[in-house]
UniProtKB/Swiss-Prot annotation:
Subcellular location, record wording: Cytoplasm
Location of the S1-like domain: 1-73
Keywords on record: Cytoplasm, Initiation factor, Protein biosynthesis, RNA-binding, rRNA-binding
Family under the similarity heading: Belongs to the IF-1 family.
Primary role: One of the essential components for the initiation of protein synthesis. Stabilizes the binding of IF-2 and IF-3 on the 30S subunit to which N-formylmethionyl-tRNA(fMet) subsequently binds. Helps modulate mRNA selection, yielding the 30S pre-initiation complex (PIC). Upon addition of the 50S ribosomal subunit IF-1, IF-2 and IF-3 are released leaving the mature 70S translation initiation complex.
SUPFAM superfamilies xref list: Nucleic acid-binding proteins (SSF50249)
Main location: cytoplasm
Keyword Nucleotide-binding: no
Originating gene: infA
Subunit annotation: Component of the 30S ribosomal translation pre-initiation complex which assembles on the 30S ribosome in the order IF-2 and IF-3, IF-1 and N-formylmethionyl-tRNA(fMet); mRNA recruitment can occur at any time during PIC assembly.
UniProt GO cellular component terms: cytosol
Name of the protein in question: Translation initiation factor IF-1
Any Pfam family: eIF-1a
Amino acid sequence: MAKKDDIIEFEGEVIDTLPNTLFKVRLENGHEIIAHISGKMRKHYIRILTGDKVKVEMTPYDLTKGRITYRGKT
């Protein structure tokens, strides 16, 4: 399990909604990843739509997947 120190944070924009609360996110550096919603966002029913600015956490072990931890103002 990754430690908190190993987490990499990126800003991005949701470009597509996929089934099972997965999203395709384009990061600020141009890469596209698949991201899921964090547990607290799911618990509080925070909705994410295409075009939303989000903050994504990734581990250095798999740079193709991430976790959405914050939804910014559109």
